[in-house]
Amino acid sequence: MESTLSAFSTVKATAMARSSGGPSLPLLTISKALNRHFTGARHLHPLLLARCSPSVRRLGGFHGSRFTSSNSALRSLGAAVLPVIRHRLECLSSSSPSFRSISSGGGSGFGGYNGGSGGGGGGGSESGDSKSKLGANASDGVSVPSSDIIILDVGGMTCGGCSASVKKILESQPQVASASVNLTTETAIVWPVPEAKSVPDWQKSLGETLANHLTNCGFQSTPRDLVTENFFKVFETKTKDKQARLKESGRELAVSWALCAVCLVGHLTHFLGVNAPWIHAIHSTGFHVSLCLITLLGPGRKLVLDGIKSLLKGSPNMNTLVGLGALSSFSVSSLAAMIPKLGWKTFFEEPVMLIAFVLLGRNLEQRAKIKATSDMTGLLSVLPSKARLLLDGDLQNSTVEVPCNSLSVGDLVVILPGDRVPADGVVKSGRSTIDESSFTGEPLPVTKESGSQVAAGSINLNGTLTVEVHRSGGETAVGDIIRLVEEAQSREAPVQQLVDKVAGRFTYGVMALSAATFTFWNLFGAHVLPSALHNGSPMSLALQLSCSVLVVACPCALGLATPTAMLVGTSLGARRGLLLRGGDILEKFSLVDTVVFDKTGTLTKGHPVVTEVIIPENPRHNLNDTWSEVEVLMLAAAVESNTTHPVGKAIVKAARARNCQTMKAEDGTFTEEPGSGAVAIVNNKRVTVGTLEWVKRHGATGNSLLALEEHEINNQSVVYIGVDNTLAAVIRFEDKVREDAAQVVENLTRQGIDVYMLSGDKRNAANYVASVVGINHERVIAGVKPAEKKNFINELQKNKKIVAMVGDGINDAAALASSNVGVAMGGGAGAASEVSPVVLMGNRLTQLLDAMELSRQTMKTVKQNLWWAFGYNIVGIPIAAGVLLPLTGTMLTPSMAGALMGVSSLGVMTNSLLLRYRFFSNRNDKNVKPEPKEGTKQPHENTRWKQSS
C-alpha cells in the first residue's frame, strides 16, 4: 500500500480539463415549448397531419452541415432544434406516441465543492435528476439505445457447435469487427467495423445482410428492430415462440414415445413368454421396419434433416451426431434384414428409442430454458396493459382507460390505490406510498408526493396520484433494464472462449472417434474379445458401438454450460435491483480483491443539508460591500440552479426555505469544473461557488480566507462563495453516513478484501467518515480531483490488484471507467451509471455484497457446469466405444446412449437453475438492517433552517 500511495503522490498534481457548460436557457425554453406544443397536438386532424409530411421531407436537409449562417449562435441553435422539429413532425405524421422529454436530464456534471463527489451539470431543469432516479441509461434525448450494435434473433441452434458456427460465420464478414452468440437466448450481438457505419441506415441494411447470410447457412435469422416502441413486442413474440415450440416438441414427444411403447411391449411380451397370434406380428421384421420409418419420417424428421443439412454445409452439430447414429442403425439393420447370410443382428428398435430419448431431453431442456428466463419475463409482467388517462384536468369525470403503449410525453394519468404505475413520470398532485421492490429490490415502500419521480411497474399502495408521463412503453427504465440485461447475456465470459474452441471442433472429433471405434472392433475386436460378439458378427458389433459413440457425445452440454448460468445470474440480479452488464463482468467481479469507495453519495447519503452561512468577521476589510446571508444564498442559488450536484441542490433548497428572491445566471456565462466548482454572471456580478482553490483562481483575496478553513470540522464540509474579486461567505453542510456503510465495510474486510476511500474533501472531513464506517485512515485518500481518482485506481492495478470502484457522481465517472469493475449507485448521476458495468438500482450499499455474492455463485455454477460437461464426455465416450466390454461385459446401446445424452444437458440446466437457491442461502447481508430509503419517514437533521419538502 505504501508503494501505491507514494507512486500516487507523484501524479497528484495532474491538471484537470475544464468541462463545458450545459445548453443555454433560450435553447431549453425552445425545447420545452416544442415539447408542450407537439405533445398537445396528438389529436390533430388527419388533413393537417398529411400536410405536415412534406415539411418533414424538407426538414430532412436541415442538418448542421447544411444549415449555414454567419451567426455561430444561430448555427448552433439550428443544428440543435431542427432535428427535434423533424422528429416531432415525423411522430405526428405517423401518429406515433414516441415523444421523449428533451427538457429533462442533468447537464454535463458539476464539481465536488471542497471535495464533494461531483455530479450534475449545466442545463438541467426541474426534472433534471429523472435519469438517475429512474434507472441507468434512461435516455432523455431522442436517440435510440444500443446505436452501435446489431442484434439478431437466430434460430436453429441446438448445441455449442451451432453457436460457435454462427459466431464464425458472422466474424468472417468484412463488415463485422466482433460478434457474440448466446445459445440460451438464441440471440447474436454484432459490433460492426467503423467503416460500416458510414452507410446511410447502416443498421437496417447490414442487419438484413447478416441475417440473410445466416439463413442461407442454415440458421434462420431476423434482425432485431432497435426502436424502443417495438422492443416489448419483440420480447413478447420471442416468449410466445418459445412456448409454441415447446408445445410442438410436446406433440412430437408424445408420438415418439407412443411408438417407443409399442417397441417395448414387443420386448416385454417376449420376456414374459406371452404367446398370441398378434405377438408374432409385433415381432415381425416388417413391423419393426414400419415403426422405425414412422419415427424417422415423423417426430425425428426435423432432427435428422437438420443434422444432414448442417453436415453438408460444413457446420455439423448435435443433430448431425444423432441423425448419423439413427440412420446408421437403420441402414445396418436394413442391410442385415435384406441379406440374412451376413449373420448381422437387426436393431430397428434402436432408432425408435434413440429419437424418443433425445426428444425427451430436448423437451426438458426447453422447459428449463423458459424457466431460466422467468426472471426477465417477470420484469416484463410488472408493466400494466391499461392506464387511466386524465382529460381536461377533471379527476372525477374525465378519465378514460387507454393502452399504456399509447401514452405520450406530457400526458396526465391517474393512479388509484392498488394500481401499477403505467409509465415513468413525475407526480403532479396527491400523496401516497409506492412499492418499488420489483424495480429496485427495495423492500420498504417509498413516500411519493408532488415533484417525486415514479417508475413504471411500481405499485401504488394507498393514496391517489396524478402523474405526468415522461417516458412510456419501451422507453421506461424497466424497458432499459430488460434491454441492457438481454445484451449483457450475450456478452461472453472469458471462460466461454475455451468452450467455443472446443465446441467448434467437437463434432468432427466425435465423428473421428466413431470411425476409429468401428475400425477397431471390426478389424481387431473379434481377436481381442471373441466372447463379446454374442454369436453376432464383428461388423454388427462395430456398427452398434460406433453409433453409440455418435449419440452419447453431447456438445449441447458444453454449449449450455456458461450461457445458462450467466442467463440465470443476470436475470436474477435484474429482479433484485442489480444491473450486471455481461458475463465478462460477472467473472471479473468474482475475482475482486480491492474495493475503493467514493465518500459523498456513496458512504454518505448524498443529501447534504445547509447548516450555516458564515460571513467574514471583518467584511469591510475584505469586501467592497457587506453581504447578508439571504443575499449570499440568493447569488449562490442562481449559479447552482444550473446543476444537479447534491451540494447545489442543498443550496437551492436553503434559498427557497428562506424565501429568497429567484435570480438567474446570465445566458452563456455558466462554467464549471468537476471537483472544483462553478462560476457565472449573476446581476452583473461574477459569482464563484466551490473550493478555496477555485475561488482564489477567480480572484478572491484576503488573509481571512485561510482562517475560515477552521470551520470545516468532522463530516461538515464547506463551500466558498466569491463575488467579483472578494470573499462573500462560506456555507457549511452536513451529510449523514449511510446506516449500512459500516457493516458493508466490515463484511468486505472479513472476506479479506482491501477497502480504500477516495474523497475530494479535506483530510479531517474524510477521516471522520472513515472512522464511522471502519476504514483505516492510512487507506483514506483525501483532497483528490476526478483525474487523480483515476490515477490512484491505475496505481492499484499496477500492483496486480483487481479493483472495484463504487461511486455515484460524474466526478467518479473516470475512476469507474478505469477500474476493473465500476459499481454505480442507482441514485447517482446518469454518467456514472452509463460507464459502470454494475449498477445498484436500489441505491443501497448492501446490494454491493449481493452483487459480489451473485457473481461468485454464478462463476461457481459455470465451473461446475463445465466440469460436468467435460467430465461426462470424457467418461461417456470411451464407455460407448466399448472400453468396459473386455472388463465387465458392459456396453451401451444407441438408445441408452441417447438417454444419457439427454440427462447430460438436463444436468447442466438444472444446476444453473439451482443458482437461485444457492444465492439466497449464501447472501452475506442477512443481518444488515435495511437503510430507510429516500422519501420514507425518518428523523430530520438539525439544521439552521427547516428545509421545504
From Swiss-Prot:
Belongs to the cation transport ATPase (P-type) (TC 3.A.3) family. Type IB subfamily. Residues 148-222 form the HMA domain. It is an enzyme of class 7 (translocase). The keyword Translocase applies. This is Copper-transporting ATPase PAA1, chloroplastic. Mediates copper transfer across the plastid envelope. Required for the delivery of copper into the plastid stroma, which is essential for the function of copper proteins. Seems to be selective for monovalent copper Cu(+) transport. Also plays a role in glucose signaling-mediated cell proliferation of root meristem in non-green tissues. NCBIfam families: ATPase-IB1_Cu (TIGR01511), ATPase-IB_hvy (TIGR01525), ATPase_P-type (TIGR01494). It catalyses: Cu(+)(in) + ATP + H2O = Cu(+)(out) + ADP + phosphate + H(+). It is found in: Plastid, Chloroplast membrane. Residues 1-103 form a transit peptide. It comes from Arabidopsis thaliana. Cu(+) binds at C159, C162. Its EC number is 7.2.2.8. Changing P384A: In strain: cv. Landsberg erecta. It is a multi-pass membrane protein. Residues 113-142, 925-949 are annotated as: Disordered. The keyword Plastid applies. Keywords: ATP-binding, Chloroplast, Copper, Copper transport, Ion transport, Magnesium, Membrane, Metal-binding, Nucleotide-binding, Plastid, Transit peptide, Translocase, Transmembrane, Transmembrane helix, Transport. Pfam families: E1-E2_ATPase, HMA, Hydrolase. The chain crosses the membrane at residues 253-274, 287-306, 314-334, 349-369, 502-524, 543-560, 863-882, 895-913. One of its GO terms (molecular function) is copper ion transmembrane transporter activity. Disruption phenotype: High-chlorophyll-fluorescence phenotype. Short roots. ATP binds at G807, D808, G809, I810, N811, D812, A813, A814.
